[in-house]
Structure formats: C-alpha cells, structure tokens
C-alpha cells in the first residue's frame, strides 16, 4: 500500500502528539495545536459550504497572520489549491493573478479590502470575497463575508476527497518584473520533500519558536508554514517587518529561529542601539563585551544564493557566532 506524501500529515501528527502545545501566536491571539487544527477543519467545511471543491483555486492577499497560516492546511485538505499573492503588488497585478489562476474565492486582509472591491468587476469567475479582518458595513452590504463569523458557524467535519501526491497544492506567482507574473505549480509531494530536506539540514524540536520575518506568500514561506508544524514548534506571526517589533518578539516570545532575506538582516543589524537594547535591561547591556564571541550564541545559516560576504560579516559581528551554508 502506498501512502501519498503530503505536508497535511504534519498537522495531523502535531495534533496527536502536541495537542496542548502552543502552535500559533498572532498579537494577542494564542492557539494550541488542537485549537489551530480545529479552526483549519472548520474553514475547510465552510469553504465546501461555499461551493469550493477539489481543484478549485482560493486566492489570499494578506500579511503574516494566523488566518493566512490556516489557509496552508484548510484549503489543500479539501483538494483545493491555494494561491498566496504578494500583497506588495498593485491592483492590476492582483487582477491578473486572480484571473489567470481562476480563483473562485478571494480572502483579503483589512489593508486590501478596498482594492479588491475595486477590481471585483474584472473578475467574473470569483464567486465569494472574504474579509479576514476589518469588514466594514458598506463592504458587508456589497456581499463580503467575515472570516471569523463564517468560521464560527461552520462545523468541524468536512468531506475529505482522495488526494494524490502529484495533486496541486499551491500556485505561487512571480512578481512579474520582466513580464506578467508567472505561476509556479507546487504539488503535495513537492512541498513534503522540501520540508523533509529542510528538517535534515536544520535541527528543530517542539521547543523551537519561529518568528515569521519571511512572507508566507514567498515560496510558501520557504515551506516553513509546514516545517515548524512538522517539528511541533510555535509559529509567531509578524505582520510587518520592523526592527523594534522583531527585537521585542525575540525577547518576549523566546524566539529561537527566523528566516530573512539579506535586506531584512541588514535592517536588523542597522537597528538603532536603543532598539537592540530591548533584548536586555540597560544595566545588563552596559556590561556586555564588544567581542562577538561573548555575545548571544546565534547560528546564522545561508541557503540557496547566499548573501554578500559583507552582509554575513555584519550579521556575525552584531549577533555573534559564525554562519554556515545549510543547503543549496
């Protein structure tokens, strides 16, 4: 008997093994793996009630929130395909990607409700629009649905269709710098093997707490939307990349791991001293040696195309430790 490879199994496993462990932190919201899994199941049921079935596309325009994280499980487990869109794009790009992917449902964060409403008339294939947060009365009157309300009224049971490992899981679009955005088609097996490859190179455990400095829409957050769950760790959402928020969460949430592009790492390294002092009381900071070897033991790993040597040197100097290449 063959078992299809799918990252959906990681959440089912986490629910069995780590039911009461903290799974998600998003500002004031905290969810255990049991609670997170049940929310995903209810959203799956709600989508089926809205007419979403196997093969249908569901588009998301949102920063790193618990609702976006839920989409990486709730949508594919009914055989539908997630289309996470770069929220930094313009309205024309949103319209193109949604239309090209054939999305049947659009889910948008409060910052993008108005722009989606403006392009709705260009998207005849879209049957439902869902506000993940911040639904206003005018938009409600225009037919928008409120995510949390729909979720509340949905059951936890839904129809699980047979899913093959070569079925589509997500379609991730490029930014279209040289032409129209192009969709990269990721299957369940693609995602599963990427997760396994990452876990081989990066040792993680249920004690790890991952900070979402990397956009979830970007290559499915380098598959960490599933990697962290596979390890039974905690997802700590970061809605906007801002050094003060990053240092505050590192301190308050006991962050053990984050991923970031060189631009973000440079922003962290260049943060004003008063921002970096968030990590320690002033009296403790003043006693620190300037030698990197005596600072916090931070491991810096590079993957894919590594940052410039100057960037790595600066990060090592500011945070301490040495970097190493973990995978191609």
Could you say what each language-model-derived stretch is?
Residues 56-57, 63-83, 87-91, 99-105, ...:
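A short helix-loop-beta submotif of the ANL/AMP-binding
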């Amino acid at each position: 008997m063959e078992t299809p490879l799918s990252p959906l199994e990681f959440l089912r496993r986490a629910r069995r093994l780590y039911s009461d462990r903290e799974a998600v932190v998003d500002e004031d919201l905290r969810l255990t793996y049991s609670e997170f899994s049940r929310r995903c199941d209810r959203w799956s049921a709600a989508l089926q009630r809205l007419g979403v079935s196997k093969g249908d596309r569901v588009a998301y325009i949102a920063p790193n929130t618990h609702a976006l994280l839920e989409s990486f499980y709730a949508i594919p487990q009914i055989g539908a395909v997630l289309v996470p869109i770069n929220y930094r794009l313009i309205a024309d790009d949103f319209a193109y990607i949604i239309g090209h992917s054939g999305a049947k449902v659009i889910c948008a964060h409060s910052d993008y409700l108005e722009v989606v409403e403006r392009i709705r008339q260009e998207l005849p294939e879209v049957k439902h629009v869902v506000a993940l947060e911040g639904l206003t009365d005018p938009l409600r009157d225009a037919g928008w649905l409120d995510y949390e309300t729909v979720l509340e009224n949905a059951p936890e049971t839904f129809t699980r269709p047979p899913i093959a490992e070569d079925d589509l899981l997500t379609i991730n679009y490029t930014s279209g710098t040289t032409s129209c955005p192009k969709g990269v088609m990721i299957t369940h097996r693609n995602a599963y093997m990427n997760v396994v490859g990452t876990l081989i190179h990066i040792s993680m455990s249920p004690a790890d707490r991952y900070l979402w400095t990397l956009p979830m829409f970007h290559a499915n957050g380098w598959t960490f939307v599933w990697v962290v769950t596979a390890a039974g760790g905690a997802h700590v959402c970061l809605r906007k990349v801002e050094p003060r928020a990053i240092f505050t969460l590192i301190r308050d949430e006991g962050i053990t791991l984050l991923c970031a592009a060189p631009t973000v790492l440079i922003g962290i390294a260049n943060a004003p001293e008063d921002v970096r002092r968030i990590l320690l009381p002033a009296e403790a900071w003043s006693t620190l040696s300037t030698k990197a070897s005596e600072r916090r033991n931070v491991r810096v790993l590079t993957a894919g195309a590594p940052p410039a040597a100057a960037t790595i040197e600066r990060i090592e100097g500011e945070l301490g430790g040495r970097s190493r290449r973990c995978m191609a």
